[in-house]
UniProtKB/Swiss-Prot annotation:
Basic and acidic residues: compositionally biased ranges: 7-30
Protein name: Inner capsid protein VP2
Main subcellular localisation: virion
Organism: Cryphonectria parasitica mycoreovirus 1 (strain 9B21)
Assembly description: Homodecamer; each decamer is made up of two conformers of VP2, called VP2A and VP2B. 12 homodecamers assemble to form an icosahedral capsid.
Additional remarks: Function inferred by structural homology with BTV-fold inner capsid family.
Record keywords: Capsid protein, Inner capsid protein, T=2 icosahedral capsid protein, Virion
Region (Disordered): 1-35
Family per similarity comment: Belongs to the turreted BTV-fold inner capsid family.
Functional note: Inner capsid protein that self-assembles to form an icosahedral capsid with a T=2 symmetry, which consists of 120 copies of VP2, with channels at each of its five-fold vertices. This capsid constitutes the innermost concentric layer of the viral mature particle.
């Protein structure tokens, strides 16, 4: 029976959470702290420690709720072992240097507000004419002063005219204010970054000055939309947690019970902390602080039906009847609650599964069945779930960022971003390097001393041996572990590289050099089997150079008869290109030197037979190893080929490693070459050659055995560990290709492009996803193999420098146990989740930029408005890139949007992509092979949030509704109301666009225009007035109309089309007639953004001239799309009778009053003509159903979706989590017994 090691009291105060290692025996030495990479056992007490850790509080309990860190999510994963866990010898080198996004953490993180979040705010408006005598201070409130009475008293203790609504967001990281009564103070800031100005992103193509839209026109709207898009990715991503034990940070406050205040008697339990002065939504307090009797009466008659606090009927979630969270009715609005609900839906869809997480970890451990050799004494990780009778409530918010969408985002990022491919390749190299660096490396001097020392009497007595040895050492090219690492990383990205052959210079040709040159050439094929399978042209050129050195006549004969190879259509290519082409440029598909030799002379000479045997040996595939993992919930199925199987060395007298067995056949070929050389007189004299070769073969055999140990023990094990990470990230297996000239590529969906009428997309033809050319990242040639063959060996190698290692006659098992324990799978998973979050934000940002440019992200009205007005003109490649950057893609020159520097990327610097498909393609095709469309990369929560934000700002119920149609008239009004419109005229005029000039006898020209006219009858129907009416000026037109209809036409209304093509002379005449109050104007197709203001009549008169000027600007403008800002006034805030001298030139055709809770609080007749509070609209009963949806009950008792029917509801329930349950659950975890090792 195992016992768990207990944490010391001091450990509770540390910021870092140390794992608890279970052991079966107390006499076993405890592993060094902070270095135990074994499976960890985390009892429930750790969760309490996580919550109380100060460093985690600053980041909002990151361990539980932030996508960037999930180590704490293995709370219920436990392992026990009969052995002390080894200290791993290898690990990830530093933190991943992956390309980061500006908002990666912002988009995936969770906020933890200390006060109630809000979207809408109620704002009382003081009356301008209230007597000082009415400013009576409210009654003293002797009880329940906290938390809302002081704030309410400050807002409602003065005389108010009305209570209106505005957007005033209270949310961590977001500043958003949109007030329909003060549009000039509009502000949208996310994480300190303001919504960008479209002027700066259009290169000056569209500005307020040259667009003709005015300062509140199209650029302003586009800027707001961009800000709303940034808000949509962050808003609602919060969790309310009441930090019990820390009074300062608690979000719930207790009410002081006081039965003497009947207005508050129905409020129970505890309240969320709030800024009740900024958000005075607790209307129960109004009867206590206001001096308006009818206002108090309205509140008292209605508000007691609306719950407030924690005492309500919504059942809280619980664990075994323990309260771990509860709903609290608070003063926030249903819109903010809906944003939060959308976030919870996202959390639910990505809910963390311990079973799947354990499967993921177990798919990343070093598997005993995949390690060959003597593994009995080794230890291997194995993860298993512990039995947990009570589900910890904190895990309801634990997520794993993997689903169909994130998988598509990752696949898209791999194909689209060259910067990411390079960054991930570099990180894979760092993982490989952590294992390759475990190699022991000798020097050429060590090798020379080993074979020329006093003890080597045989070698020293053979004088020619020194010449052989010196020639071998001269061929050694310095090769570092970094070189090997970068070369091995090619095995995992072969389809993404466009490699070209490199030349190998062979020196003097003799029997001894044949042995080592053939051996090292075979070694490069063995160490890079995947790379050569994707680049057969490299192998063909390498074999050609070797054969030209040792079989020059034979290879010329073969190529003369069979050619260099054939192309994709089977046509023979006879000549070898003078300049070796790269993979993408190669016109040869199948190479003669890589095929079986069918050409045989009638009497084949010995050298021909050796030549064909050598080709057969070089083309015989060495047995690679495939690391296979099935599909699981958090990863796709992958087959990753590595150069060979990892093998544990078990002493010098064991069987030779597979690669050594394969390579030892080189000695027999070299022996045959020596025999033939003796016959033809190549190289040294016969006696010297025989003596040298005898000693040299012994050395080479020992070097081959040494290489075999290093290859299987270090090189293949490094590849094995890298394969575990590779299979998570990359969308392709690296198995041998069906078409070695096919590259991963990305291409637009042409059918969808045509539907959107997009003709200038940059990726209509597939764009290959290549790595940039890098001379340091290429296969290792034969010269490098000389270095590896002689100088590299494992720490437990039985052979060193071509000689049996007397000091390592048995394996060093403590070192081997530590080495083969492998890299911690949790580290790999952390990198995996970082990449998933990176891909999620990247793919989402790119698609958001795309859908903004096409308008698909917008409502139909906004799409028409912006698509024709700005996007068609300005949304260039540069704007697309800058917009993506605004959304968070990249912050430095090394950003994920940057180009890699490859030739392909240089021709594809346009970042736009609209409907991406991925697949394979060759340079000979213009369509993807195995096309795989990329799905929707935008989170549903972001789409829903953005739709709600657009509706709340620009929709019919929004703060700045965009509507079509307004009229212009200089008629008089005694007072103004928000519902006021210009009176409908009986006659309307539609001007024609053409005109002619008539000349009199004095050759003076007279412009003649034409129009049609309609008479509007009592039913509103339009009846045409005659046919086309000709006129020279407006006064003449009105006289002609009066004659036709039979009565005096007064101020007819002229229709102005959206696309103004009227002659300039006529426009000037219309302006003159309008300013003379002769005609009215109607702009039925022009779009309007409204704002509101309470003004005195004098202020209205001052604003009239500005609107007259705006009418002139509109008529003189020739821009296709218009959007204008019109202010609507109300003068009833000032009581009294005024002369009919006010003119309000611009008024909407269909009036829309601002969102007001109540009006006319101070009127002489106690609210006669005013609007009482509409409790059904602003304070309905909002409940949460079993699925988490918000439902509002209307006056008929019917429950409907709250956000669509009651978007302004100012009291909704929010879920608040507690901490005390974690303490109560302490000690309930019972772990299973799971063996590690044998």
């Amino acid at each position: 029976m195992s016992t768990s090691a207990k944490k010391t009291p001091e450990s509770k105060t540390e910021d870092k959470i140390e794992p608890v290692i279970e052991q079966t025996s107390n006499d076993k030495p405890e592993p060094p702290p902070n270095k135990v990479d074994s499976v960890i056992t985390v009892p429930t007490s750790l969760i309490n420690q996580v919550i109380q850790t100060a460093s985690l509080q600053e980041n909002g309990i990151v361990a539980l709720l932030n996508h960037a860190r999930y180590i704490s999510d293995i709370n219920n994963i436990h392992v026990q072992s009969a052995e002390t866990h080894p200290v791993p010898a290898v690990g990830l080198l530093g933190s991943p240097s992956l390309v980061s996004l500006k908002y990666t953490s912002t988009h995936s993180s969770v906020e933890f507000p200390t006060t109630t979040p809000h979207f809408y705010a109620a704002r009382p408006i003081p009356s301008d004419n209230t007597s000082e005598l009415l400013r009576i201070p409210p009654v003293n409130v002797v009880c329940d002063p906290f938390p809302f009475i002081p704030g309410m008293a400050k807002q409602y203790s003065v005389s108010n005219y009305n209570v209106r609504l505005m957007i005033d967001v209270s949310h961590p990281g977001i500043e958003m204010i949109i007030d329909p009564f003060s549009i000039s103070n509009t502000k949208i800031t996310v994480d300190g970054i303001q919504a960008f100005d479209i002027n700066a992103f259009s290169g000056g193509l569209i500005t307020d000055a040259n667009s003709g839209f005015g300062s509140r026109g199209m650029p302003y709207i586009f800027s707001l939309i961009s800000g709303l898009l940034a808000v949509s990715r962050k808003i609602g991503r919060f969790v309310m947690i009441d930090n019990i034990g820390n009074e300062k940070n608690r979000v719930l406050t207790d009410r002081i019970e006081c039965p003497t205040v009947p207005g508050l008697s129905h409020m129970r339990g505890r309240f969320l902390k709030d800024d009740y002065e900024r958000y005075p939504h607790v209307f129960e307090a109004i009867p206590l602080v206001t001096n308006l009797p009818w206002f108090r009466r309205e509140i008292e008659d209605n508000v007691t039906t609306v719950p407030f606090g924690t005492n309500h009927s919504i059942p809280p979630p619980n664990v075994s009847n323990m309260k771990v969270a509860e709903y609290v009715y608070c003063g926030t609005d249903v819109t903010m609650a809906q944003f939060h609900s959308n976030f919870l839906d996202e959390v639910s869809s990505l809910r963390f599964s311990h079973v799947q997480y354990i499967r993921l970890l177990n798919s990343l451990v070093v598997n005993r069945n995949e390690i060959t050799g003597y593994t009995t004494l080794l230890q291997f990780r194995e993860y298993s779930a512990a039995h947990v009778p009570l589900q910890l409530s904190a895990l309801d918010y634990s997520t794993f960022p993997y689903d169909r969408r994130t998988s598509d985002c990752l696949r898209f990022m791999v194909h689209y971003s060259a910067a990411f491919r390079v960054a991930f390749s570099d990180f894979t190299s760092s993982l490989i390097s952590s294992i390759i660096q475990q190699s022991e490396i000798k020097t050429a001097a060590d090798f020379n001393a080993t074979h020329t020392g006093m003890g080597n009497t045989i070698n020293n007595s053979t004088t020619s041996f020194h010449e052989v040895l010196r020639g071998f050492l001269e061929n050694i090219r310095p090769t570092t572990s970094h070189d090997i690492t970068r070369a091995l990383s090619l095995e995992f990205f072969p389809s993404f590289y466009d490699l070209a052959p490199t030349s190998t210079h062979y020196g003097a040709v003799m029997a001894t050099t044949f042995l080592t040159d053939l051996l090292t050439l075979a070694m490069t094929f063995v160490m890079h089997p995947v790379t050569y399978s994707y680049n057969p042209h490299l192998k063909a050129y390498a074999i050609l150079e070797f054969c030209q050195a040792y079989f020059n006549q034979e290879v010329e004969t073969l190529l003369q008869q069979s050619g260099w190879g054939t192309n994709v259509t089977g046509i023979v290519i006879t000549d070898v290109p003078s300049i070796a082409p790269s993979r993408i440029e190669s016109g040869v598909y199948s190479f003669t030197l890589l095929q079986p030799v069918n050409l045989q002379p009638l009497v084949p000479p010995p050298m021909w037979n050796l030549f064909t045997r050598t080709l057969a040996f070089l083309n015989a595939p060495f047995q690679t190893y495939t690391v296979s993992r099935p599909a699981i919930a958090y990863a796709q199925a992958r087959n990753v080929v590595i150069p060979g199987v990892p093998i544990v060395p078990s002493g010098p007298y064991s069987r030779a490693p597979p690669v050594a067995t394969y390579l030892l056949s080189v000695i027999q070929l070299a022996t045959t070459y020596t025999t033939i050389s003796k016959q033809v007189g190549l190289g040294m004299s016969t006696s010297k050659l025989a003596a040298a070769m005898t000693s040299w073969r012994v050395v080479v055999r020992a070097m081959i055995l040494n290489f075999g140990e290093w290859f299987h023990g270090v090189y293949c094990f490094a590849a094995y560990n890298a394969a575990l990470l590779y299979r998570l990230i990359m969308p392709y297996d690296n198995t041998p290709p069906t078409n070695w000239q096919a590259f991963p590529s990305v291409q637009e969906d042409l059918a969808r492009l045509n539907l959107h009428n997009i003709h200038n997309a940059p990726r209509i033809i597939p764009t290959q996803a290549m790595f940039p050319h890098d001379d340091t990242r290429t296969v290792l040639g034969p010269k490098h193999m000389h270095s590896i063959l002689a100088l590299y060996h494992t720490p437990s190698s039985a052979h060193v420098c071509g000689k049996l290692n007397a000091d390592k006659t048995v394996a060093d098992w403590p070192d081997l146990v530590s080495f083969y324990y492998g890299i911690d799978p949790q580290e790999i998973v952390e990198i995996y989740k970082t990449v998933l979050n990176l891909a999620s934000s990247f793919g989402e940002s790119i698609q958001l930029s795309s859908e903004m440019s096409t308008g698909d992200l917008l409502s139909p009205d906004l799409r028409v408005l912006l698509r024709s007005g700005i996007m068609a003109k300005v949304f260039s490649a540069r704007t697309f890139q800058l917009f993506a950057k605004f959304l968070g893609v990249g912050v430095t020159d090394g950003s994920i949007m940057s180009q890699s520097g490859s030739l392909i990327d240089m021709f594809n610097t346009d970042p736009r992509i609209y409907f991406p498909n991925t697949g394979m393609t060759t340079v000979f095709t213009d369509q993807l092979i195995q096309s795989n469309p990329v799905g929707d990369m935008i989170r549903p929560a972001v789409r829903n949030n953005f739709r709600i934000l657009l509706d709340s700002v620009f929709g019919p119920e929004g703060m700045m509704p965009i509507t079509s149609g307004f009229t212009a008239s200089l008629e008089m009004h005694s007072n103004l109301r928000f519902s006021l419109t210009h009176s409908i005229r009986q006659v309307e005029i539609i001007f024609g666009t053409g005109h002619q000039v008539q000349y009199d006898d004095g050759l003076r020209g007279l412009h003649i225009f034409s129009c049609t006219a309609n008479q509007i009858d009592a039913t509103g129907q339009r009846v045409p007035i005659g046919n086309m009416i000709a006129f020279a000026h407006i006064e003449q037109l009105i006289d002609n109309l009066s004659t036709i209809v039979g009565y005096s036409v007064v101020r007819p209304i002229a229709i102005v089309p959206e696309i103004n093509q009227l002659p300039a002379v006529l426009v000037e005449d219309i302006i003159t007639a309008f300013l003379g109050n002769v005609i009215c104007l109607s702009f039925p197709e022009h779009r309007v953004v409204r704002s509101y203001a309470y003004l005195s009549p004098a202020s209205v008169v001052a604003a009239t001239q500005l609107e007259r000027n705006l009418v002139r600007e509109i008529l003189e403008d020739r821009t296709v799309t218009h959007c204008h800002h019109i202010r609507i006034f109300d003068t009833e805030i000032i009581q009294g009778v005024f002369e009919t001298t006010m003119r309000k030139p611009l008024l909407p055709q269909r009036p829309k009053c601002p969102v007001e809770l109540t009006t006319h609080l101070h009127t002489p007749n106690a609210r006669v003509g005013g609007t009482p509070i509409n409790f059904d609209r602003f304070l309905p009963l909002v409940e949460v159903d079993a699925s988490g949806r918000l439902l509002a009950t209307n006056q008929r008792g019917v429950k409907r979706d709250a956000i669509t029917t009651r978007p302004y509801a100012l009291r909704t329930p929010l879920l608040v989590w507690m901490q005390s349950p974690y303490q109560k659950l302490e000690g309930t975890v019972h772990s299973q017994t799971v063996r590690v090792g044998i």
